């Protein structure tokens, strides 16, 4: 690998959340890279770091502020390192593999002693750590990069493999001396248990030598409906969970879109854009049963990057403008029944 381009990227998200303090959106990899048609190297190693903390609760677009005020909010700390190795086959074709390493910590009361408990030990933590779901993709520039130097569009098609442990378990304390061992919450599981199809579309257009536009589109199709993992945290599912199909975890689709403008000054690049990411309540293929937390986040996304010979550094800190915890299929069934 004589010609190896290494990219380090850092994405930090704070105060991002859906209902129950959870963000179920998993890392998509390479979301901080604004690649152009690089003809100088055959290999590229991308190390994409992403961290976020979630603690707010939403019903629709309305924040449930009383959860924070009462101290019963759920707090998630999630970190992922996406390791992506890309091999350029020709000027237009490339192959890539992404392997995420994930570490999660979840703090709550309702999963343990209960939100009404006055015990000072009522808030407990569950954790998960390991390899996430691996993605293998093929990419093609739709326009010959040699002929089109101002702009191009790259399409990607891949397969997402269920290499992450989607049955990860930890301890749920019920009193100071009694506990249950069971699957951790869906938001901190290392994988979803499904084999998916990853669709990507990336484009750029240079308005001048310094000013350019970029866009990224990503959609993960997960045909599997449920993965069979219990949501009862080591206990027995209640009648309503069984009736409304939330006793096991779903395998939902996922999407992400980014658009923006970047300005380059020698080796420094500054970008500003918008970012949309979320989980739909209904999948493109397969059923919609099982427990999921659908919704979306709209953010502004400043990005700064710097190039050091064969190493590129990226950093991004998105700021959420809108959060919407939409109804799942089960939520709709409950609403119709009541």
Residue ranges and their predicted role:
Residues 72-78, 125-132, 189-195, 249-253, ...:
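Short sequence motifs at beta-strands and strand-loop junctions characteristic
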Residues 58-60, 67, 225-338:
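Outer membrane beta-barrel transmembrane domains
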Residues 20-21, 34-42, 54-56, 92, ...:
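Short loop/turn motifs that connect adjacent beta-strands in outer-membrane beta-barrel proteins
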Residues 51-80, 187:
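Surface-exposed strand-loop-strand hairpins of Gram-negative outer-membrane beta-barrel proteins
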Residues 107-247:
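Outer-membrane pore/translocation modules
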Residues 43, 93-95, 146-148, 210-213, ...:
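Repeated loop/turn-to-beta-strand initiation elements of outer-membrane beta-barrel proteins
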Residues 49-55, 99-105, 133, 142, ...:
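Transmembrane beta-strands of outer-membrane beta-barrel pores
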Residues 36, 47-49, 83-87, 97, ...:
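Residues on the lipid-exposed face of transmembrane beta-strands in outer-membrane beta-barrel proteins
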């Amino acid at each position: 690998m004589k010609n190896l381009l290494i990219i380090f990227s850092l994405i930090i998200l704070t105060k991002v959340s859906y209902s129950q303090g959870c963000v179920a959106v998993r890392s998509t990899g390479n979301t901080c890279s604004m690649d152009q048609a690089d003809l100088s190297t055959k290999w590229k190693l991308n190390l994409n770091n992403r961290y976020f903390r979630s603690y707010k609760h939403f019903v629709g677009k309305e924040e449930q502020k009383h959860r924070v005020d009462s101290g019963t909010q759920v707090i998630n700390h999630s970190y992922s390192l996406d390791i992506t190795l890309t091999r350029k086959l020709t000027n237009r074709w490339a192959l890539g593999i992404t392997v995420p390493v994930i570490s999660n910590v979840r703090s709550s009361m309702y999963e343990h002693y209960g939100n009404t408990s006055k015990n000072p030990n009522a808030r407990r933590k569950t954790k998960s750590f390991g390899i996430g779901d691996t993605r293998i993709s093929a990419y093609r520039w739709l326009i010959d990069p040699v002929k089109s130097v101002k702009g191009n569009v790259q399409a990607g098609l891949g397969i997402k493999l269920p290499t992450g442990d989607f049955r990860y378990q930890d301890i749920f304390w019920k009193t100071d001396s009694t506990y249950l061992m069971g699957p951790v919450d869906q938001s901190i599981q290392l994988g979803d248990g499904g084999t998916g199809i990853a669709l990507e579309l990336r484009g750029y257009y240079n308005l001048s030598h310094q000013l350019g536009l970029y866009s990224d589109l990503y959609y993960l199709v997960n045909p599997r409906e449920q993965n069979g993992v219990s949501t009862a945290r080591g206990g027995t599912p209640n009648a309503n969970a069984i009736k409304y199909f939330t006793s096991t975890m779903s395998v939902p689709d996922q999407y992400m879109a980014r658009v923006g403008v970047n300005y380059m000054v020698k080796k420094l690049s500054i970008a500003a854009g918008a970012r949309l990411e979320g989980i739909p309540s209904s999948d493109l293929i397969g059923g919609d049963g099982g427990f999921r937390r659908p919704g979306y986040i709209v953010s502004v996304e400043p990005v700064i990057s710097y190039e050091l010979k064969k190493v590129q550094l990226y950093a991004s800190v998105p700021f959420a403008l809108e959060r919407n915890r939409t109804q799942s299929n089960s939520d709709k069934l409950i609403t119709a029944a009541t």
